Structures are given as C-alpha cells and as structure tokens.
Curated annotation (Swiss-Prot):
Its main location: cytoplasm. Keywords: Cytoplasm, Histidine metabolism, Lyase, NAD. It is found in: Cytoplasm. It comes from Pseudoalteromonas translucida (strain TAC 125). Catalyzes the conversion of urocanate to 4-imidazolone-5-propionate. The keyword Membrane does not apply. Its EC number is 4.2.1.49. This is Urocanate hydratase. It catalyses: 4-imidazolone-5-propanoate = trans-urocanate + H2O.
Length: 557
C-alpha cells in the first residue's frame, strides 16, 4: 500500500480566530502545514507534494496525521521534533523555545547524492523537503514572484537602459516556482514565453492569473509575442512543449529572445525533468521500471537545452541560470562551457543580500484578505519613501491572487523586518487584525543558505561552499525564540548542492511575542549582513557599521 498517496483527501487550513490547539503558536504551525497541502496551493497535494519536483510537507499520510494530532496537544513548554517529515519526539523545553524543530533531507556529505537519497526515500526513511515545502511556509507562486520581479527589473536596468518595453523573455517551467516567471516578467514590463510539458500546469497558471494566454504551437506563440512587443504590451504566453526542443528550435530558426532563463525542475533529473521525445505517461512508467534510464535521458536533454541557451547567449540574449542547477547537470554531461552564463544571484541580486534584504513574507491566519490589505498599508506607512516597494505592493494587490490563506511577499532587509513585524503584532493586539499573523521567509535569503551554484555562487572570497553559515543561522534563530526553525539539504539545486535554514515566528499580539519578534527578526537578517561582510563586500560592511552589528573581526576596520 502506498501511504504517500490518498486521492480522497482534501486539506484546507482552518480560518478565523477559534483554535483547537493549546496556543496560537502551535495552531499557527498546524494551519501552515495544512495550508501547504491546500489544493489551491500545492502542486500534487494528494501525494503530499507541495512544489519543486517531490518537495513534500510530510513524509507520508500517517506522519501527517500524527503531526497534526501532536500539534493540537503540544504544551507551551514543549518542542516537537520532526525528522524528514516524520514526528519523532516531544521534549520539555521552555516557553521561549521553538515549538517545532525540523530537519529535512540531511545526509552525511559523502552520501549526499540523489542515488542514495532515492534509496532511502523509497524505503520511507526520508523525504525531500525542498525549501518551504517541508518547513510549512509555502504561500504558492507568490512566494517567488517578487524575487523574480526584482531580477527582471535588474536585468532591464543592466541590459535595456531600464525599460523592458518591447522586450521578451524565453524560459521553461510552470511549476510552483517557475509559475511565478510569467507574472513577474509582465510586472517588470517584459513579454514572456514559458515552455511547459504538463498542460495541467499551464491551465492552473492561467486560472490563477500568472499566465495570460495558452498558445497552440510555437509559431502561434511567437506571433503572440511579436504582436505584443510591437504594441509595447506586456503579455505572457504558455506553450505546451519540451524546453530542450523549443529552445533548440529557436536557435535553428535564428529567433533570438532578449532574455533567456529556465525554471524547470532540473535539480531533480528523476522526477523533475521530462526527457526529449518522452510523454508524461511514459516518464511516469519508466520512473518505476528503470529510474536510472530516466536520469540518463533527462540529463542528456538538459545538455541539449543548455547548449541552446549558450547559443542564444552568443546571439545576443541576456542569459542567466535561475537556480535550478541545470548548468551543473549539463556540465556533468560534457557541456564544458555550461557555466559561461551566470547565476541570477551574483548577476543581479547579491547587492540586496548584502543589506539583509530578501523574501520576507507573512500570512493572515484569519483567512481574511482584509488583514493582508491592512498590513500592506502599514508597510507603506512605516516605509514612506520607497516608491519601488510601494509600486510592488500596489501591483501585488491588483495582480496576485491569494492561494490558500492570504499572504504577502515583500523584499525588505535588516533595517525593516523587525519593526514591520512588531507593528503587525501590535495590530493583532489592538484588534485591527482579526487573528494572528505568521511571519517567515524563503530559505533563499541572505544568511540562511550555502549553495555554490545559486545563492552563494562566485562569492568575493571564494567561500561559496562553506555551509557553517546556514547552521549558525538556524542555531541563532532557535536561541532567539522563533516559533519553528528548519534545517534542510538539497533545496532548489538538488542533493549535494545546498544546505539551508528556515525560520517562522507568530505575531499573536502578546508581549512575549513582541520580545521574541524583536530578537528573531533582527538577528535573522543580521546573519546575512554578517555573512557578506565576512566575505568582504563593502555594502555589507557599511550596513553592519550603520546598524551597529558587533562583528569582532570587522570592528577595528
């Protein structure tokens, strides 16, 4: 019997101010776990898969049921330990300790590869937590929209004199992460052609407002893109097809996009990438019958796609890796120049990381969108002079549909995270919000990840692979009193290529929450400034001095 699949389950988080757990801290963790599996949020909820190939919220359905039951009975001086999606222990701690500590997908380095992980996964001994799937803070495609938007805005500034009008992006993948690309591109002023091999994903993104239109074929797609570019409109087009096929066809046809990237689930060649010439049904069958053949065929197709991306770069397209490790997969297949195009973090995002700026997010446990709109207004009030941020919030309200519990993503840094969260806590206390707010972030943040092919690619001092930093981040957030803390391996880029930590805290309006928020949401982004200052970035050093961070090795500079 497959205890990971239950087609009869439909999970939705409770809304409102009535709780069944013993406190809002544990009620929040329960609701966020359930929200990760809401059919409006998750990619394959019946199989516990949230996003990113096989990124799960719990190891299996018995584990899920036991986590829910345990959170309902957990006392305010107890901590639940979750090991790769399975609840393994409840221990007496104290009221300011985290209520849940999570470790997902972690393997001793020598064994940290997909082959060994897949053996353990098949035996039911592990699960892949991705980043926010197994740490219960996924908010649907909105969670990555602003980061993608910031990247596209930076590309327009660097390559097109600040204007994306009449320019278009070619990319692949419309899963939980890739699905953000078309909306982010059009928000930034680009047109976007997104290739996806699963038609249900195109339809889902159209339904949720992330894709504007579905093309019948490549010729139709290019006609739609060309017409929109000529008019100066920003249009997103979903095209059913194989990314390796379509990218290669464009090269042969001499059609050069302005921007090229990719967000297929290339990080997981077994479960995340469809080989050329294969149907979805054939791939599903082969995963059971001959997984090694699937991996081989998928990586060969990735090599074809990356060669096409390199050719488009040579033809003049601004080309970047969007963090799915496709360059590494192609390199392993003999594409020796796969890394000739850069990753998006060193190319466009790192200056933000140097100031601790990253994907801050919050969720209204009331389930009422008005609570999010009120917090949007509070952000504008507290950060009055940031026109770019205000523009983002305005666009988000108009164009982003909530998935599951209403949520907002907003890239802010060390200067602002704690004071925004404290304001939200005060709004809960005063009754301005109908229920508490959950505050967290992606693991893709300035101080919480080591990923040499993504977030820590091309660090100034060569410390790309040093993973002490996310471990220190998780330890500090635990000591600071976060509500739940997670430590994962392999998110984004796959097994053996990343380690990363997550943090979530609940603003329940209490004075105790106020104290915890002040510690956690200062210390967490401060570790990002620390990490980049230690690597020698002047922006980070200046930020550390301005914010009076105590960094012993830098204090005398």
């Amino acid at each position: 019997m497959n205890n990971r699949l239950d087609n009869n389950r439909t999970i939705r988080a409770p809304h409102g101010d009535k709780i069944s757990a013993k406190s809002w801290q544990t009620e929040a963790a329960k609701r966020m776990l359930m929200n990760n599996l809401d059919p409006d949020v998750a990619e394959h909820p019946h199989a516990l898969v949230v996003y990113g190939g096989i990124g799960r919220a719990a190891r299996d359905w018995p584990s899920y049921d036991k986590i829910i039951a345990t959170l309902d009975r957990l006392e305010d001086d107890e901590t639940l330990l979750v090991q790769s999606g399975k609840p393994v222990g409840v221990f007496k701690t104290h009221s300011n300790a985290p209520r849940v500590l999570i470790a997902n997908s972690n393997l001793v380095p020598h064994w940290a590869n997909w082959e060994h992980f897949n053996e353990l996964d098949k035996k039911g001994l592990m699960m892949y937590g991705q980043m926010t799937a197994g740490s219960w803070i996924y908010i649907g495609s909105q969670g990555i929209v602003q980061g993608t938007y910031e990247t596209f805005v930076a590309m327009a500034k660097q390559h097109f004199a600040g204007s994306a009008k009449g320019k278009w992006v070619l990319t692949g993948g419309l899963g939980g992460m890739g699905g953000a690309q078309p909306l982010a591109a059009t928000m930034a002023g680009f047109c976007a052609l997104v290739v996806e091999c699963d038609e249900t994903r195109i339809d889902f993104r159209i339904k949720t407002g992330y894709v504007d239109i579905k093309a019948n074929n490549l010729e139709h797609a290019l006609q739609l893109i060309t017409n929109a570019c000529v008019k100066g409109d920003a249009l997103s087009v979903g095209l059913l097809g194989n990314a390796a096929d379509v990218f290669s066809t464009l090269v042969k046809s001499g059609v050069t996009p302005d921007v090229v990237t990719d967000q297929t689930s290339a990080h997981d060649p077994l479960n995340g990438y469809l080989p050329q010439g294969w149907s979805m049904e054939h791939a599903a069958k082969m995963r059971e019958q001959d997984p090694k053949a699937v991996v081989t065929a998928a990586k060969q197709s990735m090599a074809v796609q990356v060669r096409a991306m390199l050719a488009l770069q040579q033809a003049g397209a601004a080309t970047t890796d969007y963090g799915n490790n496709i360059r590494q997969m192609a390199f392993d297949e003999g594409v020796t120049n796969a890394f000739d195009f850069p990753g998006f973090v060193p190319a466009y995002i790192r200056p933000l990381f140097c100031e601790g700026i990253g994907p801050f997010r919050w969720v209204a446990l009331s389930g009422d969108p008005e609570d999010i709109y009120k917090t949007d207004a509070k952000v504008k009030e507290l950060i009055p002079d940031d026109a770019h941020l205000h523009n983002w919030l305005d666009m988000a309200r108009k164009r982003i549909q909530f998935q599951g519990l209403p949520a907002r993503i907003c890239w802010v840094g060390l200067k602002d995270r704690a004071r925004l969260a404290l304001a939200f806590n005060n709004m809960v206390k005063n009754g301005e919000l109908k229920a508490p707010v959950v505050i967290g972030r992606d693991h893709l943040d300035s101080g919480s990840v080591a990923s040499p092919n993504r977030e820590t690619e091309a660090m100034l001092d060569g410390s790309d692979a040093v993973s002490d930093w996310p471990l220190l981040n998780a330890l500090l957030n635990t000591a600071s009193g976060a509500t739940w803390v997670s430590l994962h391996h392999g998110g984004g880029v796959g097994m053996g290529f990343s380690q990363h930590a997550g943090v979530v805290i609940v603003a329940d309006g209490s004075d105790e929450a106020k104290q915890r928020i002040a510690r956690v949401l200062w210390n967490d982004p401060a570790t990002g400034v620390m990490r980049h200052a230690d690597a020698g970035y002047d922006i980070a050093k200046n930020c550390a001095k301005e914010q009076n961070l105590d960094l012993p090795m830098l204090n005398e500079e």
